[in-house]
C-alpha cells in the first residue's frame, strides 16, 4: 500500500487527509482552525483587510499532520509516499533573502503588511484598476488577455503594489513575494530561498500575469509604467519558470521529517489553488463545470487545447495551460460570496438575540441554541412555500463580483421589497441570488463558445443543503451532480502527491483510482425553472442598472441607458 497526504489550507482552517493511493479510501483526516484568525487578529473588515499570520499556518498544519499520522498504524506511517498542498489564492506574503515570511521576524511579528494577504482582502482595489487600465493602453501588449481582461484586487500584483506603497519597512525588507500554495511545499522541502522556490503554474498563470506567449511575466517596463516602486524594491523578474503540481518540488527536509516522524524520502508535490485541486479530487473530466462551494465559490473547467484554440475568454479569472491537469487548459471563475451571504443574514437576525442574551444571562444557553437554528428554520420555511411570485430580487455582490468581469467595488442590492416580505421570503431571495450568480458564470463560458457538458457541486453546502442546491439546479435548468467527498480539495492534493511520488503515472490514472464518486444527481423541476427564468431576467436587468452606481469616480456613467437594463414594474 502507498499512502498520500493532502493538505488543504482554507480561509479558516487547514485539513489534512490521508488517502490509500490504490483504492482512494480516505483513511484519516483532521481539521485544525487557525488560532489567531479565530480571534479576529490582523483583520479590519470595514476596510476589507484580511491577513493571516504565517504561524497560524505552521502551527495548524503541524497539529493536523500529527493527528492524522497518529491515527495511522506504524506500518501505514511507513507507507506515506507523498504530501500535496492546496490553498486559497491569491494569498501572497513578502519573504526575505532567506525565504522567511517577514512576519516570522521579531520586528514584523505584529505587522499585518508582513503577513499573508488573504484572497478576500480587497484593500488594493485602486491598484487592481490601475493594472487593468495599463493592460488596456492602446498600442501596448494586453497582459490581461488570458486572465479575463480585468485584473482583480484579490490577485498577486495588486496586493504587492498596495503593501509596497503603504509600508516602506516591508517594501525594503522584502526580497520577493510568494503564494501560500508555493510557500508550504517550499517550507516542507526546505527550499524557501527565493532562488530555490519552484513557482506553481496555477498561481502564476491565474494571478501573476505569467504566460508562455510573452515569455513569462510582463517585462520590467510594464512595472515601471505601473509604478516604479515595484522595480525599485524587487528584482525583475520575480520568477521565470513555472511548474505543474504533479511534479515534485523536493522531499521532506530534515527539520520537518523530525517534527513529523516521517522519513526524508517523502515526496513533496507542487502546490496549486484549492479549487483547482478540488476539481481533480471530484474526478472532473473535460468540459465539466465544477463548483467548489463554501464561503465563496470557485468554478473550474478544463478543456483540451484544440477546443480553446487562441480564443481569450473574457470576464473570467484566467485560462492557463496545466493549471488543473497537465496538457489541458484550466479555466477559472467564481462568486466572491456564497455561504458568506447566508451567514451575513444569520448575523442580522441574530443581533437582537445577542442583545437579549447580554441583558438576561440566564437565557444565554437557550438563545445560543435558537441562533444555531435560525438558518435551518428559514431554509425549511422557504422550501415549504417558495413564494416565487413575491420573491425579492437580490444581487449577490455582497463581497464584490469575481465573475463575470471582476469588480470589487460592487455592493449587494436587495430590491422588490414590500410590506408582505417576511424573513423566509428574503432568505429565499438570497438563495436565488447565489443561484443566479452561478448561472451568470455558466453563461460567461457558453456564450463565448466554451461548452459546459455537465455541472458538479462539491463542499459542505452542496452535500448538506439540498434546498439551496435544488434552487441552483432549477436556475441552471440542467442536472446538478453532487460529489460525495466532503474533502475534495484535500483529496485532489493527495492525488497530485501520489503522482509526484510515482504511485500513479499521471493525473487521469490517479483519478480513476482515487477521485470521489458522485453521490446524487439533482434534476431541474420544469415549473420552478420557468419561474426562476423570469426572475433571472430581472436579476440581469438590475445588475446592469446597479453597476452604474459603483463606477470609479473618474469614469463617467454611460449617457444612454443600456437597453437590457430597462426595468419594468
UniProtKB/Swiss-Prot annotation:
Catalytic activity of the protein: D-ribulose + ATP = D-ribulose 5-phosphate + ADP + H(+); L-ribulose + ATP = L-ribulose 5-phosphate + ADP + H(+)
Tagged with keyword Nucleotide-binding: yes
Presence of keyword Transferase: yes
Pathway(s) of this molecule: Carbohydrate degradation; L-arabinose degradation via L-ribulose; D-xylulose 5-phosphate from L-arabinose (bacterial route): step 2/3
Pfam families associated with the record: FGGY_C (PF02782)
One cellular-component annotation, GO: cytoplasm
Recorded family membership: Belongs to the ribulokinase family.
Entry protein name: Ribulokinase
Organism: Citrobacter koseri (strain ATCC BAA-895 / CDC 4225-83 / SGSC4696)
Gene that produces this protein: araB
Amino acid at each position: 500500500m502507498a499512502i498520500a497526504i493532502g493538505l488543504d489550507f482554507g480561509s479558516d482552517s487547514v485539513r489534512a487527509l490521508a488517502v490509500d493511493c490504490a483504492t482512494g479510501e480516505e483513511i484519516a483526516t483532521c481539521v485544525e482552525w487557525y488560532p489567531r484568525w479565530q480571534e479576529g487578529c490582523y483583520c479590519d473588515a470595514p476596510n476589507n483587510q484580511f491577513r493571516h499570520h504565517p504561524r497560524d499556518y505552521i502551527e495548524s498544519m503541524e497539529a493536523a499532520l500529527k493527528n492524522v499520522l497518529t491515527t495511522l498504524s506504524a506500518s501505514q506511517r511507513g507507507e506515506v509516499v507523498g504530501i500535496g498542498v492546496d490553498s486559497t489564492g491569491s494569498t501572497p506574503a513578502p519573504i526575505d533573502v532567506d525565504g522567511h515570511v517577514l512576519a516570522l521576524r521579531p520586528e514584523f511579528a505584529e505587522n499585518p503588511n508582513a503577513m499573508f494577504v488573504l484572497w478576500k482582502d480587497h484593500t488594493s482595489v485602486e491598484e487592481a484598476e490601475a493594472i487593468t487600465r495599463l493592460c488596456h493602453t492602446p498600442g501596448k501588449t494586453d497582459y490581461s488577455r488570458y486572465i479575463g481582461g480585468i485584473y482583480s484586487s484579490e490577485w498577486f500584483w495588486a496586493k504587492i503594489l498596495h503593501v509596497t506603497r503603504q509600508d516602506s519597512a516591508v517594501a525594503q525588507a522584502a526580497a520577493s513575494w510568494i503564494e501560500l500554495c508555493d510557500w508550504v511545499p517550499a517550507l516542507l522541502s526546505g527550499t524557501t530561498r527565493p532562488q530555490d522556490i519552484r513557482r506553481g503554474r496555477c498561481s502564476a498563470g491565474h494571478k501573476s500575469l505569467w504566460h508562455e506567449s510573452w515569455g513569462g511575466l510582463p517585462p520590467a517596463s510594464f512595472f515601471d509604467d505601473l509604478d516604479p516602486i515595484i522595480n525599485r524594491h524587487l528584482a525583475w523578474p520575480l520568477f521565470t519558470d513555472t511548474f505543474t503540481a504533479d511534479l515534485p518540488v523536493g522531499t521532506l527536509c530534515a527539520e520537518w521529517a523530525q517534527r513529523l516522524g516521517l522519513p526524508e524520502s517523502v515526496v513533496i508535490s507542487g502546490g496549486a489553488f484549492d479549487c483547482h485541486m478540488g476539481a481533480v479530487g471530484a474526478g472532473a473530466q473535460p468540459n465539466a463545470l465544477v463548483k467548489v462551494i463554501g464561503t465563496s465559490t470557485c468554478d473550474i473547467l478544463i478543456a483540451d487545447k484544440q477546443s480553446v484554440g487562441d480564443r481569450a475568454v473574457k470576464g473570467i479569472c484566467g485560462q492557463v495551460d496545466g493549471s488543473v491537469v497537465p496538457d489541458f487548459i484550466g479555466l477559472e471563475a467564481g462568486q466572491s460570496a456564497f455561504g458568506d451571504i447566508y451567514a451575513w443574514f444569520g448575523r442580522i437576525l441574530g443581533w437582537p438575540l445577542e442583545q437579549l442574551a447580554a441583558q438576561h444571562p440566564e437565557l444565554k444557553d437557550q438563545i445560543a441554541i435558537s441562533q444555531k437554528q435560525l438558518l435551518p428554520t428559514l431554509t425549511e420555511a422557504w422550501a415549504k412555500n417558495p413564494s416565487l411570485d413575491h420573491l425579492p430580487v437580490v444581487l449577490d455582490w455582497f463581497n464584490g463580483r469575481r465573475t463575470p468581469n471582476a469588480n470589487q467595488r460592487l455592493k449587494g442590492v436587495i430590491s422588490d421589497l414590500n410590506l408582505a416580505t417576511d424573513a423566509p421570503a428574503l432568505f429565499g431571495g438570497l438563495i436565488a441570488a447565489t443561484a443566479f450568480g452561478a448561472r451568470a458564470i455558466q453563461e460567461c463560458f457558453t456564450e463565448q463558445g466554451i461548452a459546459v457538458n455537465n455541472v458538479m457541486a462539491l463542499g459542505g453546502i452542496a452535500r448538506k443543503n439540498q434546498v439551496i442546491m435544488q434552487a441552483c439546479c432549477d436556475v441552471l435548468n440542467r442536472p446538478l451532480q453532487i460529489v460525495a467527498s466532503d474533502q475534495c480539495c484535500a483529496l485532489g492534493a493527495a492525488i497530485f502527491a501520489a503522482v509526484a511520488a510515482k504511485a500513479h503515472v499521471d493525473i487521469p490514472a490517479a483519478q480513476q483510482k482515487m477521485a470521489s464518486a458522485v453521490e446524487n444527481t439533482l434534476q431541474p423541476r420544469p415549473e420552478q425553472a420557468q419561474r426562476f427564468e423570469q426572475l433571472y431576467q430581472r436579476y440581469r436587468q438590475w445588475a446592469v442598472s446597479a453597476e452604474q452606481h459603483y463606477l470609479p469616480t473618474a469614469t463617467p456613467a454611460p449617457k444612454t441607458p443600456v437597453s437590457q437594463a430597462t426595468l419594468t414594474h
